């Protein structure tokens, strides 16, 4: 009996087009992830006793800064593709070509989750100082939604035919077809690749499950989970998966080298993941090894 083969083939990045405007799958998936995250984190915030409406006030700021941060991060490491003769592009509005910097064409793909995490964390910090909230408590109710949002958003890579892995060698029970136009030059003759979007989506669902189970057990008093512990666990568990999945990617952001191999250089996402694991590990050691609270950069409310 032949092994079951699941072949993933993208229908294309656009769901439909209305005049000059197109609804892209990636944008729709992000919108769905944001709505689910709003409801989930709001529910977790109530269980943590946080201020009512806090998450709905934070969310627009968090989404905007995360998207901008993700794009800036990506463009910074891929600047060769957005500079010189590639600096300018155009957008067609009712038949009129409007010149714009190519770096702002986010609808064409090109964002990096680590940039979103850095910018988003900074936004949460500033927001907490402004609203005098405990930074780690707020972050703890956000990270399950972040993990779930990543699981959903990774399917945008599938529709865009991007962020895929190396060609499949031998027989696998799954494979991803990539059109010729989207293949790296050195893999132009390969049709099927590792669906790294699927690997990371599944991994993020597992991370989400772990975080939710831990949160619920803590809420019921079955587990001691100090403020910040859940955030540290997210940093470690997400990064563990990203390190090995990134090794399969054909389009990594590289430092001192060019994709797909980054030969002679370093894969930025792996470096960032290792740094996140170190931060998360240190945080857990501080909480459970030294039995001390994490320093709070926010301004907790005074109940005096």
UniProtKB/Swiss-Prot annotation:
InterPro entries documented for this protein: Lgt (IPR001640)
Binding annotation for a 1,2-diacyl-sn-glycero-3-phospho-(1'-sn-glycerol): 154
Compartments it resides in: Cell inner membrane
Pathway where this protein functions: Protein modification; lipoprotein biosynthesis (diacylglyceryl transfer)
Entry EC no(s): 2.5.1.145
Keyword tags: Cell inner membrane, Cell membrane, Membrane, Transferase, Transmembrane, Transmembrane helix
A GO MF term: phosphatidylglycerol-prolipoprotein diacylglyceryl transferase activity
Keyword Transmembrane helix tagged: yes
GO cellular component, one term: plasma membrane
GO BP annotation list: lipoprotein biosynthetic process
Annotated TM spans: 18-38, 58-78, 106-126, 133-153, 195-215, 221-241, 268-288
Matches recorded under Pfam families: LGT
Keyword field contains DNA repair: no
Membrane disposition: Multi-pass membrane protein
Enzyme class: transferase
Domain of life: Bacteria
Protein family according to the UniProt entry: Belongs to the Lgt family.
Role summary: Catalyzes the transfer of the diacylglyceryl group from phosphatidylglycerol to the sulfhydryl group of the N-terminal cysteine of a prolipoprotein, the first step in the formation of mature lipoproteins.
The protein's name: Phosphatidylglycerol--prolipoprotein diacylglyceryl transferase
Organism: Prochlorococcus marinus (strain MIT 9313)
Species lineage: Bacteria, Bacillati, Cyanobacteriota, Cyanophyceae, Synechococcales
